[in-house]
Each structure stands twice: as structure tokens, then as C-alpha cells.
Regions:
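Short coil/loop residues immediately preceding or within conserved phosphate-binding loops
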Residues: 36, 66, 107
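Glycine-rich acetyl-CoA-binding "A-motif" of GNAT/NAT acetyltransferases
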Residues: 119
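Core segments of cupin and vicinal oxygen chelate
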Residues: 7-49
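N-terminal beta-strand motif that seeds the catalytic metal site of vicinal oxygen chelate
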Residues: 1-16, 125-144
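Long, continuous compositionally biased terminal/linker segments
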Residues: 43-81
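Short beta->alpha transition motifs characteristic of CBS
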Residues: 104-105, 111, 122-129
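Vicinal oxygen chelate
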Residues: 9-14, 70-115
Length: 144
């Protein structure tokens, strides 16, 4: 499906500190990068990778309207912890952790904007048993 996700930043050191803190509760670890202006994270044994770095075209990084990166979490607690880590690291709140049944039953998520304004989403889809279910397609409400 996906190979990788790339997020631009204006300050790599600041972004690395932010994403190190935010990815840890999700079980996503920073991995070695052979590129000086880029850092990379990955959940062990899984794809895709997250790359954060300075844009190749040397233009300032900026967020895209309607663009969002969503990271799966193993539990509601992991969503809560990732959200708290993001806010503590300077993220802007875009939606506190909570159920979002309009997306799907058991859909629990939180939204933040990172230090460069990129929208980030943490999500856990739990069945009625409370166990996390594998990622699946969302059924979005009709946009009228």
C-alpha cells in the first residue's frame, strides 16, 4: 500500500525532538538515516516509514490544506499518551482524544498540528470488546 510518508520542516532538530516524543507512545522508533537533512521513524517490522526533513527544493516547508498524517495506535491509552506528548512538545490542539462514531464504531482519535503546522492524527479502532482492530477503510459521512 504505502511506502513512506514525508513531512517537511523548517527546523530539523526541533522536529526530531517533537516526533521522538510523539511516536514513542505509538511504538514507532527513530531509525538511522543516511541523509543529513532528514530523520526517519518506523514501527519495527512494519512499513511505511515516516520521513521528516528539509524540503529538497530548498523552499520553506509549509502544511497543505486538507492534508493529514494518521498514525495507528494499539489502544485508546496510546492515543491519549501520543496526544499528551504532542501537546507537551508544543503541538497545537486540533481535537482532544475521544470517540468519533461518525467515522466508524469504536473509532477513537485525537488531532494536533505539529511545530510546522502539519495536521497529525492518532487513531485506535476498538471493537465492542475493547480490543484494537486492524486498520480498515473509514465510512465518512456524506459531504453536502
Amino acid at each position: 500500500m504505502s511506502s513512506h510518508l514525508t513531512i517537511g520542516t523548517r527546523d530539523l532538530a526541533r522536529a526530531v525532538a517533537f516526533y521522538d516524543a510523539v511516536m514513542a507512545p505509538l511504538g514507532i522508533e527513530r531509525i538511522p538515516s543516511k541523509y543529513q537533512a532528514w530523520a526517519s521513524w518506523q514501527r519495527p517490522g512494519e512499513a511505511p516509514k515516516l520521513w521528516v526533513g528539509l524540503p529538497f527544493n530548498k523552499e520553506p516547508a509549509h502544511q497543505g490544506n486538507g492534508w493529514m498524517a494518521a498514525f495507528s495506535a494499539s489502544s485508546r491509552k496510546a492515543v491519549d499518551e501520543a496526544y499528551a506528548a504532542a501537546i507537551s512538545a508544543g503541538a497545537q490542539d486540533e481535537g482532544a482524544p475521544g470517540l468519533r462514531p461518525h467515522f466508524a464504531p469504536g473509532y477513537y482519535g485525537a488531532y494536533v498540528r505539529d511545530l510546522d503546522g502539519n495536521k497529525i492524527h492518532f487513531v485506535c479502532r476498538e471493537e465492542a470488546t475493547g480490543a484494537a482492530s486492524p486498520p480498515h477503510a473509514l465510512s465518512l459521512p456524506n459531504a453536502e
